[in-house]
């Protein structure tokens, strides 16, 4: 395709330089393996992004951020699959077997469609990463502020639709750039059968409308592709990375200040319920369960933001060199395109492929919820049951803390709950238990639903009933939302048949 007549030169480069020889050496070293590596990354990335789409669209995973990540995975899948067909055909078929059917009009149409589709999908993915950083910034800024903006699923759907639509509209000048030219096959292939010497070959070229008016359409599409699709999103990504890092620092400082203040609170709390005095002390209050503690919530915020920062950083690292090269290619003389851009084009293409493949690795390494959902979707139920049967395996989302509960029953003779010899009476119940972040289920149906095991795929180590006394019904006037642990506390009253050993056995069965 002819670019010289539509080129604008601001910087003139020398005709010869030792750097040109270095770039040529890099090209000669990497180009023979580029096609194989590209196909491998395309196949791997297509499978990985398909897994991302399946997992992130599950009902339990539908959040505004995950919906944007799903749209990014869809765009990356389109880019990788289109690039897979292009690389396979033109690297291993068209140039190797110079037959007219491999250079037909249909393949020329595919080449133009591949150029447009890859540009729109890849640019949409880049701008969606900017939208992702913006959504996370707004979410963190409005956290704890009742009057702040709350990002919902509907907002994420609108953001995805608007982003993709605007990218497609801005790419409209690029749609007018190309036409299909017919030329002899011997001008395309060097190793050609003499019988196909004058056979037609169809290739894309610059359209006449793009060259009209001093190449107005071509220049417009070129600068839109370089500035709007490369440089501008990279600048915004850099800004949001800085803002998110600043928010992380503020959150960390606030959490440390709150934890420091919480250390001055009394460690033991005593409450009264139904004539009983309950004393509860929590060990290790500085690091409680991940689902309910202050530090756990802060760590979840940090992990989510760090994961999104990793995604944005990968996008920034892979896109910034391409943006710089695209701008310089439009500003420098023809020597830049011949000796630098063309020789480094394969490496820039490799950066794009790596950026499209890294999301799955980031999710699996930094998101426990994604790993659990991926394990539940793609791992068979029998394997899950065998995994849960191991006593040393605990769900990573379970809260874990050591809680000491002491049941002190007032004594009619002396109100201190002790006998005359200074020891507690026989009716005094004291138990030290380990609370795991699950509540006692009233029947085995809840356990079956939680573990995914049923009569077809049973989990033998999981008990289907508990040997201790049944839980008492909720009395009238009590809060229906009272958890099962509260009923266990009530079972230590005078009319209860449960003993301290029964309570211990109850929690041991959990």
From Swiss-Prot:
Residues 487-499 have a biased composition (Polar residues). The chain crosses the membrane at residues 36-56, 65-85, 108-128, 156-176, 224-244, 308-328, 344-364. Keywords: Cell membrane, G-protein coupled receptor, Glycoprotein, Membrane, Receptor, Transducer, Transmembrane, Transmembrane helix. Its main location: membrane. Glycans are attached at residue 186. It is found in: Cell membrane. InterPro entries: 7TM_GPCR_serpentine_rcpt_Srw, GPCR_1, GPCR_Rhodpsn, GPCR_Rhodpsn_7TM. GO terms for molecular function: G protein-coupled peptide receptor activity; neuropeptide receptor activity. Residues 452-510 are annotated as: Disordered. The keyword Transmembrane applies. PROSITE patterns: G_PROTEIN_RECEP_F1_2. GO terms for cellular component: neuronal cell body membrane; plasma membrane. Residues 1-35, 86-107, 177-223, 329-343 are extracellular. Expressed in head neurons including the RID neuron and the paired AIY neurons, and in tail neurons including the paired PHA and PHB neurons. Not expressed in AVE and AVA neurons. One of its GO terms (biological process) is regulation of cellular response to heat. Residues 57-64, 129-155, 245-307, 365-510 are cytoplasmic. It is a multi-pass membrane protein. Belongs to the G-protein coupled receptor 1 family. G-protein coupled receptor. PANTHER family: G-PROTEIN COUPLED RECEPTOR DMSR-1, MYOSUPPRESSIN RECEPTOR 1, ISOFORM B-RELATED. This is G-protein coupled receptor dmsr-1.
């Amino acid at each position: 395709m002819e670019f010289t007549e539509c080129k604008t030169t601001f910087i003139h480069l020398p005709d010869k330089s030792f750097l040109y020889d270095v770039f040529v050496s890099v090209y000669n070293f990497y180009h023979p393996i580029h096609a194989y590596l590209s196909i491998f990354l395309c196949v791997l990335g297509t499978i990985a992004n398909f897994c991302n789409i399946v997992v992130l669209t599950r009902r339990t995973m539908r959040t505004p951020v995950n919906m944007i990540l799903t749209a990014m995975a869809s765009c990356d899948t389109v880019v990788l699959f289109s690039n897979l067909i292009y690389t396979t055909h033109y690297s291993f078929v068209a140039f190797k077997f110079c037959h007219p059917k491999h250079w037909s009009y249909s393949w020329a149409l595919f080449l133009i469609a591949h150029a447009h589709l890859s540009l729109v999908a890849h640019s949409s993915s880049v701008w969606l990463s900017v939208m992702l950083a913006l959504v996370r910034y707004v979410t963190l800024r409005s956290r704890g502020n009742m009057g702040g903006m709350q990002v919902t699923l509907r907002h994420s759907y609108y953001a995805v639709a608007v982003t993709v639509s605007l990218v497609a509209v801005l790419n409209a000048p690029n749609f007018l750039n190309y036409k299909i030219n017919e030329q002899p096959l011997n001008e395309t292939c060097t190793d050609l059968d003499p019988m196909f010497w004058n056979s037609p070959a169809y290739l894309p070229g610059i359209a006449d409308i793009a060259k009209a008016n001093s190449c107005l359409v071509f220049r417009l599409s070129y600068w839109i592709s370089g500035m709007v699709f490369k440089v501008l999103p990279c600048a915004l990504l850099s800004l949001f990375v800085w803002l998110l890092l600043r928010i992380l620092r503020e959150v960390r400082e606030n959490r440390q200040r709150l934890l420091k203040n919480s250390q001055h609170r009394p460690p033991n709390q005593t409450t009264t319920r139904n004539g009983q005095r309950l004393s509860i002390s929590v060990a290790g209050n500085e690091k409680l369960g991940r689902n309910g503690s202050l530090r756990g919530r802060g760590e979840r915020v940090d992990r989510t933001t760090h994961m999104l920062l990793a995604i944005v950083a990968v996008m920034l690292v892979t896109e910034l060199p391409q943006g710089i090269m695209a701008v310089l290619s439009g500003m420098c003389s023809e020597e830049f395109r011949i000796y630098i851009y063309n020789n480094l084009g394969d490496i820039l293409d490799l950066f794009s492929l790596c950026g499209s493949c890294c999301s799955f690795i980031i999710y699996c390494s930094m998101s426990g919820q994604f790993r659990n959902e991926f394990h539940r979707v793609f791992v068979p139920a029998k394997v899950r049951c065998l995994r849960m049967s191991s006593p040393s395996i605990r769900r990573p989302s379970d809260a874990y803390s050591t809680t000491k509960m002491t049941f002190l029953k007032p004594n009619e003779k002396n109100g201190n709950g002790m006998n005359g010899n200074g020891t507690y009476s026989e009716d005094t119940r004291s138990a030290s238990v380990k609370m795991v972040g699950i509540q006692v289920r009233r029947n085995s149906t809840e356990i079956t639903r939680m573990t995914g095991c049923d009569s077809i795929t049973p989990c033998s180590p999981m008990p289907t009933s508990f040997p201790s006394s049944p839980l008492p019904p909720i009395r009238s006037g009590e809060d229906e939302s009272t958890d099962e642990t509260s009923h266990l506390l009530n079972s230590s009253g005078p009319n209860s048949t449960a003993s301290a050993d029964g309570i211990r056995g109850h929690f041991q069965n959990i």
